[in-house]
C-alpha cells in the first residue's frame, strides 16, 4: 500500500477549582457555570467553569468517562447545557447558527460512521461554510482541499473510497477536512485513534506546526498522557464531570492534579535512575518532557 506522510515538523498559571474560570480574557472557548444532564434529574456536570486560551495547544485530559468529550460537544453545539453559558470566540453558542459556528471552529468528533464518499469529497466538506450560492468549489477551494490532503498525508488516497482505507487512514482524512475548513480554532476529539505510534507523533507535530507557524488555537481531547505532556502548552484536567485544574502544562503537573486524576506519581526526569531502583515489581516508568510517571501503590 502507498505510504503517505503527515506534513509537519517534530518539534504560563495553574488554577484549581475555586478560580478555574478566572482566566486571561484571551480565550477561544469559555464555559461559565455550566451544568449538563444526559438523563432527566441526574446532573453529569454541575457549575463547571473553564477556559481554553487563544493561541495555544491545549489538551483536555482525565480518566475515561470524566466528561472530556462532553466538554467538546458542548462547544461544538452538538449538546446544549442544562444551565450556564458556553462561548466560542466570545459568541454564546446558543445563539450561533451551524454555519456561523463552522466559520469559528473546525471540529473532529468521534464517530464510527464511514460516509460513502471519496477522501477528496470528504475533505471538500470542510470548504462548505465558505461556499456561496450554488455551493460549487472554486479554484481557491480546490487548492485548499489539495493543501489539506497533503498536510494530513492523505493526498495519495484522494480518489479512494473511505471504506477502502484503514482506521488510521480514515482518521487522517477527517483531520484533513478540519484543515480545509481553515478556522482559527481547531477542536480534536481523540485525533490519534487508530494511528500507530509514528503517525501519532507526526500528527502531533502537525498540530504544533499549525499553532507555531499559523497561529491556530488547538484544543484536543486525548487519552495518551505521553502525547499530551509532550505537545501541549496548556492542560485542562477533569475528574467525574469536574475541572480540577487548568494552566500551563508544567505548572499543572507541579500542582499534582494530573497525578491525582490518573493515580500516578510524577517526578523530574533526573530522578529516573533512583526511581527505577525503588519501583514496585511490574510497574512501568514512562519518560516525557523531563518527567517520569509511574503508578501509585494501591
For the regions a language model picked out, list residue spans one by one.
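Conserved ABC transporter NBD signature motif
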Residues: 84-92, 101
